[in-house]
Amino acid sequence: MRLILLSSLLLLGIFLANGHEQDPDGKVLNSLIDALMHLQREFANLRGAFLTVHKARSFGSGSERLYVTNKEIKNFEALRQICEQAEGHIPSPQLENHNKAFANVLERHGKEAYLVVGDSANFTNWAAGEPNKAAGACVKADTHGSWHSTSCDDNLLVVCEFYFIL
């Protein structure tokens, strides 16, 4: 949508740079201005609709982050590729309500899933005795949202995290 708006502005600029000899009554210019205004309204409507859907999807979880599964069972590397292709991220809960929203997905499907824990994480939810590097280099969350060290080769539920900053 932004590409269309930019293209319209470019056309308007080209038209203005070429002068008004070809359009002495300003009909073409007015038509371009009307089209641009229509595109701006459409963009505003789409943005509003998108935000409404996003707010509705995140309402129940109390988190602005969405945790979505395709119900596949994969290892960590496959998860990374799937989330990247979907323009999402491997889950990385930064707050308790993020972790609860993530755990709700796992509980609903009765499966565990990978997550990543940043070096400077302010929030963690390690299970007792964790992290345990001997268990593996990756981290998984159980259906209650507790975190456990695990092998990156384990096949777990594919869950990707999506968040929107506008």
Swiss-Prot record:
Domain annotation C-type lectin: ranges: 46-161
Signal peptide: 1-19
Pfam families membership: Lectin_C
Domain of life: Eukaryota
Gene Ontology MF terms in the entry: carbohydrate binding; phospholipase A2 inhibitor activity
Role noted for this protein: This phospholipase A2 inhibitor binds directly phospholipase A2 in the presence or absence of calcium.
Protein name (Swiss-Prot/TrEMBL): Phospholipase A2 inhibitor
